[in-house]
């Protein structure tokens, strides 16, 4: 195998223009500034978010794990998502803030990206409820001398207080669910397989979502529909079992 020293390890992959986000710039600035307010009170130099929910909430980018790590670093004056090269420029387009990409040429390139974004930081907030023991050890090895403090609970309380924009989107989501429920009820009949009912419901919701937003990523919309014995658990998967009268 050849040497990888001359390969790109951390880079900017700013392909295209920023995409439409469901929340305004003012709303996203508010969220990031809430983090900075906590940093100031807690004497923290930078925050590294790693969970789906926090990265999505504070940047607008929802990652797909696919065996690679993702992050978002918030400092006093900047917010940057960290993504894998497999995603191309999409994370940049979906991030409120900057983005850097790491390649697969070295296994520790993700940590190189973190070091690049947290130079000089002595106290860094991480999500204790998301960073497992091996992950924590790798962070300590990558950032020697840095003290890690928990931002997980503080960020949870920040996300708990909903803004007017969030409440509006929640109401739209509830209405979409009502439309899916109506389509589900209409499709139910003896002899119809569960999956056909679920398809009718999910399709109705997807069309509603697609029609109500100027640009939207259509993902993770589905219907849990069960019949007969399958109704004994809330999260029992859809099957091809036919509905009995």
Protein language model features and the residues they cover:
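A composition/biophysics-driven feature that prefers long, compositionally simple stretches
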Residues: 1-180, 238
């Amino acid at each position: 195998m050849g040497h990888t020293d001359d390969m790109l390890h951390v880079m900017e992959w700013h392909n295209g223009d920023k995409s439409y986000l469901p929340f305004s710039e003012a709303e996203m600035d508010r969220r990031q500034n809430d983090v900075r307010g906590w940093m100031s009170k807690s004497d923290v130099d930078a925050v590294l978010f790693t969970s789906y929910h926090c990265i999505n909430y504070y940047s607008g980018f929802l990652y797909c794990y696919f065996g690679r790590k993702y992050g978002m670093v918030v400092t006093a004056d900047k917010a940057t998502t960290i993504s894998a090269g497999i995603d191309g420029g999409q994370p940049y387009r979906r991030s409120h803030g900057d983005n850097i990409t790491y390649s697969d040429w070295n296994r520790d390139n993700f940590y190189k990206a973190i070091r690049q974004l947290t130079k000089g930081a002595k106290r860094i907030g991480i999500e204790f409820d998301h960073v497992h023991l091996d992950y924590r050890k790798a962070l300590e090895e990558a950032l020697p001398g840095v003290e890690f403090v928990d931002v997980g609970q503080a960020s949870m309380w920040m996300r708990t207080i909903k803004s007017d924009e969030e409440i509006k989107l929640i109401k739209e989501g509830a209405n979409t669910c009502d439309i899916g429920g109506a389509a589900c009820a209409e499709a139910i009949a003896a002899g119809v397989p569960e999956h056909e009912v679920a398809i009718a419901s999910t399709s109705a919701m997807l069309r509603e979502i697609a029609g109500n937003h100027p640009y939207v990523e259509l993902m993770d919309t589905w219907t849990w529909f069960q019949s007969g014995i399958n109704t004994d658990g809330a999260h029992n998967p859809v099957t091809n079992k036919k509905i009995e009268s």
